[in-house]
Every structure is written in structure tokens, then in C-alpha cells.
Design a protein with these regions (language model features):
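Nucleotide and nucleotide-moiety/phosphate-recognizing core
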Residues: 1-106, 112-126, 134-147, 151-155, ...
């Protein structure tokens, strides 16, 4: 599923790629770098979505990037159009989040300069992304229910893809 996400990010015109957490994948596209959660340097060893966001922001900050697009590994159906709209929304906000029957915080883009804010929220005990980012300028980007579909394995991804192709 990471391969599909990589292809969608690349097709959206992005040119720096990383996946956060877990173990490094062998034989994976070398342009898609593994970033360990530990890069966040919070020292607690706890795993959380917010720590993953903090790790992504820290990696982007250390590599001189201005913004990040963060997609959970279980949302591989996000379109290039939505990715581009998330990035464009950063012209007027600190964070842009996918919206489909509510905010979908595993699909977002953020300016790297929010890193210190996210770190402070994490150190204050917050772990929910939406609570940590609530006092920032947030844009909501409408997307389809398909894009927000939680896909937990390759077989499900293939089935959804086949069904989408048969509907065309």
C-alpha cells in the first residue's frame, strides 16, 4: 500500500518522500525514505499518530522542506487532486485536513513551521492530532468517501481498485 501512496504523491508533483515509523522496507523504492519515530526526540518510546506527525515534521525541518503531506498508511486511495488541494490550502492556513463527513486527520498537509507547536502539545500530554492542532489556522479540503476509506491489507485494496475500474 505504501507503493500506491508513493505513486499518488509523485503524480501530485511532490518530489521528496518519506514514510514514518515501523521498520524500513527492503526492496522498496529508494526515493521513499524510512524515517524512524525516534527522530522526534521526545524520549518516551510511546507510539501515537501525533508522534508520527511530529517525526514527519522533524524530518522535513531537518531536510529544509517548507511543508509536509501526511497520509496514514491505511488511506492509499487519496487522489492526486486532493493532495494538490491540501498543499494549495497551505497558502492561507497552517494545516489543511481532508473533510468527508467530518475531519479525517490521517489525510493532511502542514507547514513545517508548526513543528515547535506540535512538540509543545506532545510534551504537554496531547496525543490526538485534532486536539494538538486546534488553535492553528486550519483549512478543510472536501474529498470523497472513497478517499477516506480505511484499507488494512493489499487484498482489500485490490478489490476496491477492481470494483472502481468495473464502474467506469
Amino acid at each position: 500500500m505504501l507503493q500506491v501512496i508513493h505513486e499518488n504523491l509523485s503524480a501530485a508533483g511532490l518530489d521528496s518522500f518519506a514514510y514514518v515509523g515501523g521498520r524500513a522496507r527492503e526492496g522498496f523504492n529508494p526515493t521513499f525514505r524510512h524515517v524512524p519515530d525516534e527522530i522526534a526526540d521526545v524520549g518516551d518510546g510511546e507510539q501515537s499518530s501525533l508522534r508520527g506527525v511530529l517525526a514527519a515534521l522533524t524530518h522535513a525541518w531537518t531536510t529544509g522542506l517548507e511543508a509536509v503531506v501526511i497520509l496514514g498508511c491505511d488511506v492509499p486511495l487519496v487522489t492526486t487532486n486532493t493532495i494538490q488541494r491540501l498543499v494549495s490550502a497551505l497558502d492561507v492556513s497552517d494545516v489543511s485536513v481532508a473533510e468527508c463527513d467530518g475531519d479525517h486527520w490521517s489525510i493532511l498537509a502542514a507547514r513545517v513551521d508548526i513543528r515547535e507547536h506540535v512538540l509543545a502539545q506532545y510534551l504537554a500530554g496531547r496525543r490526538a492530532i485534532h486536539r494538538a492542532l486546534t488553535d492553528l489556522r486550519i483549512s478543510r479540503v472536501v474529498c470523497s468517501t472513497t478517499e477516506c476509506t480505511n484499507v488494512n491489507d493489499v487484498a482489500t485494496l485490490q478489490l476496491i481498485t477492481e470494483n472502481r475500474l468495473s464502474d467506469v
